[in-house]
UniProtKB/Swiss-Prot annotation:
Gene Ontology biological process terms from the UniProt entry: photosynthesis
Main location, first listed in the record: membrane
Binding site for [4Fe-4S] cluster: C600, C609
Catalytic reaction annotation: reduced [plastocyanin] + hnu + oxidized [2Fe-2S]-[ferredoxin] = oxidized [plastocyanin] + reduced [2Fe-2S]-[ferredoxin]
HAMAP family: PSI_PsaA
Binding, phylloquinone: W709
EC numbers on record: 1.97.1.12
The protein, known as: Photosystem I P700 chlorophyll a apoprotein A1
Sequence intervals crossing the membrane: 76-99, 162-185, 201-225, 309-327, 368-391, 407-433, 455-477, 558-576, 616-637, 681-703, 741-761
GO molecular function: 4 iron, 4 sulfur cluster binding; chlorophyll binding; electron transfer activity; magnesium ion binding; oxidoreductase activity
Cellular compartments annotated: Cellular thylakoid membrane
Binding site for divinyl chlorophyll a: M700, Y708
Amino acid sequence: MTISPPESGEKDKKILESPVKADPRPIDFAKLDKPGFWSSKLSKGPKTTTWIWNLHADAHDFDIHTGDAEEATRKIFSAHFGHLAVIFIWMSAAFFHGARFSNYSGWLADPTHVKPGAQQVWAIVGQEMLNGDLGANYNGIQISSGVFHMWRAWGITNESELMALAIGAVVMAALMLHAGIFHYHKAAPKMEWFQNIESMLNHHIAGLVGLGSLAWAGHCIHIGAPTAALLDAIDAGTPLVINGKEIATIADMPMPHQLCDPQIIAQIFPGLASGTGNFFSLNWLAFSDFLTFKGGLNPVTGSLWMTDVSHHHLAFGVIAIIGGHMYRTNYGIGHSMKEILDSQQGDPILFPAPKGHQGLFEFMAESRHAQLSVNLAMLGSLSILISHHMYAMPPYPYIATDYMTVLGLFTHHMWIGGLFIVGAGAHAGIAMVRDYDPAKHIDNVLDRILKARDALISHLNWVCMWLGFHSFGLYIHNDTMRALGRPQDMFSDSAIQLQPIFAQWVQSIQASAVGTSILAGTAEALPHKAISEVFNGSLVEVGGKVAIAPIPLGTADLMIHHIHAFQIHVTVLILLKGVLYARSSRLIPDKASLGFRFPCDGPGRGGTCQVSSWDHVFLGLFWMYNCLSIVIFHFSWKMQSDVWGLTGGNFSQSAITINGWLRDFLWAQSSQVLTSYGSAISMYGLMFLGAHFIWAFSLMFLFSGRGYWQELFESIVWAHNKLKVAPTIQPRALSITQGRAVGVTHFLVGGIATTWAFFHARLFGLG
């Protein structure tokens, strides 16, 4: 890829003087009528059916459109605004539906008895069957997205506020679309601007993250927390009094702007009306009524305290603003990322790399795929972390007792995390093929890792085999012993125990730490319940349902956790092998010249198929899917058994055999989806069936040979020619890579939608 040369007379200018180029690409609407205008080959139009596949495969591969790194980077930057516009439109739709069609007000008035509903379905051919009784005289479709709980935490108390948000989100979408067009066609940033790493870190960390968190803290403090205090008091049956008036219902609530009146807010949080004098005199304890550190859950709502959440966002915002100013920008002070990396030499004994991290800054700064890979890996890991917060630290009021929402959000964030991490492997492979220059990386950390790849992959392979045989072997042993009627010889909590002693130790030290530490700057100890209740804490009940409870761990957990470890390591093995061998291998030394995706290394070279970096991503997706399926199955059954009290605590004895998983989880819990016809959850029965078909359809692509299809097409074309109705676009069988792409897509979509229907029907069916 080439990099545009600097324009004449601009080499000596500072970046801030001329960061953009005016009118680099005038808007040409004529291009939009020509599919594939960015490719001389595709713009000629279709001659065979392969054209449509190449159009989709290459439309967003900006690298190959012009070969100019600056142009590709501008397209990425512009596409970000387009992405934000789509997000705002999606948010607007959610707000609008909440305002016009949902039962938000009814749910808000009685969240422990009324279920969240999206809309009422019109009766066209019997769809009114789907309108279930959600309480408070509302019949509609039950939802599990958690938006109602989130809106209550924000401080939204009526549909008018939702409609205002819907309008605001549409306006923001229009602004984002305009920004995307403007920053590509009218004022496009130059490459030097994109490469100004320290300024970018300053802007992203201090500006977007820091100020964003601080602004959100402001909303939580002035609107969210006061509204939550009033609503919690109503729900607890002890309404607050404002200006002599009892706030007994939502209709009595002050308007949002009234909560900013010092006279009104002083009656909810006196510290909030005390003015800024306490801030500048460092008397910050005056603010401890609305910036709290209570820990644990609000017993009324079963969620984190809104005042704790406010405190968290304020602290995080301040930390990010300070952290974002660590880097050297215009004033010659602070850290230089290049200097930091170049000075890192690595461990001289464990990992000797004479040139250390030299060259790493340039590679990361110039390779968009390398940047994206790191960001996807981190964001994917963060998404998986968020999954666990859904049950360990429920963030929104009443969400913890809406079991399908907890399970749905856990599952959703798991899938997102898994897809992002596989994406990290994909873009790392592309970076190695397209952006990595071996001549620039001699004896540095990247070079040393590539030289050690055989040791890395062979050891990882050994770990996978060890984990796989041993963890699966425990289940095989238990199934055999149970079949032979020898329960005393099984691995279980009542026979041969395999207790997760390290996990239990972590739980106990978390619980024992409460009340032993001193808060910084005060003489107060950490309050009780300063950690999650799942770590040997206490049970919190809301509306007669368990919101959170200690999660005991035993032999069944140790066994399934080792299955998790096995599957995670196999997924990592596949993805890492795809990256480390992306450019070359013993089998194909010139793999880099074949590109990121190729079917085989030509005829006569047996064993060279399915070795491209793309094929590793393809295989990694299957293992990611298998891995996370077991994770969400484990979570679903464990919570139903040991926390929510829905399956009589059968996890510890049933989950120790394969037969137990098949019989007591999959079969027993699928009764709701299999018997859903004729009820309000019948759509999940149809989805369960249809998604199985989509999944099975994928096998036709994954197991097929191209020759069969091409031969079939030829005979069909012959028949059309005989009838003189032959198409002008010649049919072509899918390439090996295209077939695999279609196969894995339907496999994942079918599998995920099947699980979606299974989970929803189960928990909605139980009520």
